[in-house]
């Protein structure tokens, strides 16, 4: 199912060649500032992993990974990563990082079952980051502090780009607003979860929606989350209001990661207790992995937002249906 929002009178602020230069400037600046703000070291990351390790991100539990056999390892099958949520935690231990230190990677992934639209592509590029914390720091206060630091990087990036390209619009407020999924449901009980996000984002301009993955009082979930990386009580999404498309625009999903207790509880709720036999999960239950906070920040997403684009295909080269390509060209949307 392909759906396309076509903003009336849309005209890109930058042509294709200027856009390519601006993409590089945006990514370089944001990456450097994020690493400084969170004390992160860049590390190399895998494009594929062995399924038996349990390291791939199961996302909402139904997305199929791209898998292929490799001649050099006896024809065994490997999977292209969906994200590096679990891999990073094992890497922090293996590389000898200490509390207060972290890593980040340039993560490229293929999500073959993604529904393609203005914001979603089968090609995913993000900065995946992870930082070690103490068990005593697994609190909402820690989460909010890190979110505020990341938001300050967004603010600096917006100011940097508006200095380079004065015709670009600035959309971000001074501060980010914190809200839980239950508070959001209580505020807008008649709306769907996505409609609630847009309603509040439109008012506040930048929000952090906390506690995603568990069931709300209404009996529904705000959104799905895999049970084995984020602690559903200590996670959230950074969401901005994006006037070009008039919607809530998620730029990052993040959270304090599960400990040995919340992992077991969430696996049970999700009906995934068989995962306890996988290598990653065994190490976590046995307290052999560090306590961490981490997340992913969409590279194409932030370029699209800051450069005022109507479609993610204007800031990344991907695959689109013939119908979408045709519609885009009729509405001044210049796909790469």
UniProtKB/Swiss-Prot annotation:
Keyword field contains DNA repair: no
Cellular localization per UniProt: Cytoplasm
Catalysed reaction, written as an equation: L-aspartate + NH4(+) + ATP = L-asparagine + AMP + diphosphate + H(+)
Any one Gene Ontology molecular-function term assigned to this protein's record: transferase activity
SUPFAM superfamilies the record matches: Class II aaRS and biotin synthetases
Lineage: superkingdom: Bacteria
Pfam families attached to this UniProt entry: AsnA
InterPro entries the UniProt entry points to: aa-tRNA-synth_II, aa-tRNA-synth_II/BPL/LPL, AsnA
Gene Ontology CC entries for this record: cytosol
Biological processes annotated in GO: L-asparagine biosynthetic process
Gene3D superfamilies: Bira Bifunctional Protein, Domain 2
Keywords: Amino-acid biosynthesis, Asparagine biosynthesis, ATP-binding, Cytoplasm, Ligase, Nucleotide-binding
Pathway per the UniProt entry: Amino-acid biosynthesis; L-asparagine biosynthesis; L-asparagine from L-aspartate (ammonia route): step 1/1
Position of the signal peptide: none
Catalytic class of the enzyme: ligase
Entry's family note: Belongs to the class-II aminoacyl-tRNA synthetase family. AsnA subfamily.
Entry protein name: Aspartate--ammonia ligase
Naturally occurring in which organism (per UniProt): Ruminiclostridium cellulolyticum (strain ATCC 35319 / DSM 5812 / JCM 6584 / H10) (Clostridium cellulolyticum)
């Amino acid at each position: 199912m392909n759906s396309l929002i076509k903003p009336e009178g849309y005209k890109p602020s930058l042509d294709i060649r200027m856009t390519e230069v601006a993409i590089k400037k945006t990514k370089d600046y944001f990456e450097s500032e994020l690493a400084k703000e969170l004390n992160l070291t860049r590390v190399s990351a895998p494009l594929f992993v062995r399924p038996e390790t349990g390291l791939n991100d199961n996302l909402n539990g139904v997305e199929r990974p791209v898998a292929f056999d490799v001649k050099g390892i006896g024809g065994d099958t490997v999977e292209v990563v969906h994200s590096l949520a679990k891999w990073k935690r094992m890497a922090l231990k293996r590389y000898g990082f200490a509390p207060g230190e972290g890593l980040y990677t340039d993560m490229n992934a293929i999500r073959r079952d993604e529904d393609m639209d203005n914001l979603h592509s089968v090609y995913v590029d993000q900065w995946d980051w992870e930082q070690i914390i103490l068990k005593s720091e697994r609190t909402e206060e820690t989460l909010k502090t890190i979110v505020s630091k990341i938001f300050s990087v967004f603010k600096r990036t917006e100011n940097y780009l508006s200095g380079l390209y004065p015709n670009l619009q600035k959309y971000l407020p001074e501060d980010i607003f914190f809200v839980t999924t239950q508070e959001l449901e209580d505020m807008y009980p008649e709306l769907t979860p996505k409609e609630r996000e847009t309603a509040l984002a439109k008012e506040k301009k930048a929000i952090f929606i906390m506690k995603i993955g568990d069931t709300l009082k209404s009996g529904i979930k705000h959104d799905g989350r895999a049970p084995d990386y984020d602690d559903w009580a200590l996670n959230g999404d950074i969401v901005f209001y994006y006037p070009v498309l008039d919607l809530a625009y998620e730029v990052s999903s993040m959270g304090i990661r599960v400990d040995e207790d919340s992992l077991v509880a969430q696996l049970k709720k999700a009906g995934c207790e068989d995962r306890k036999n996988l290598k990653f999960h065994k190490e976590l239950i046995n307290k052999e992995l560090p306590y961490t906070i981490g997340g992913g920040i969409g590279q194409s997403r932030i370029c699209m937002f800051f450069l005022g684009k109507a479609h993610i295909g204007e800031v990344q080269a991907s695959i689109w249906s013939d119908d979408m390509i045709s519609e885009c060209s009729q509405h001044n949307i210049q796909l790469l």
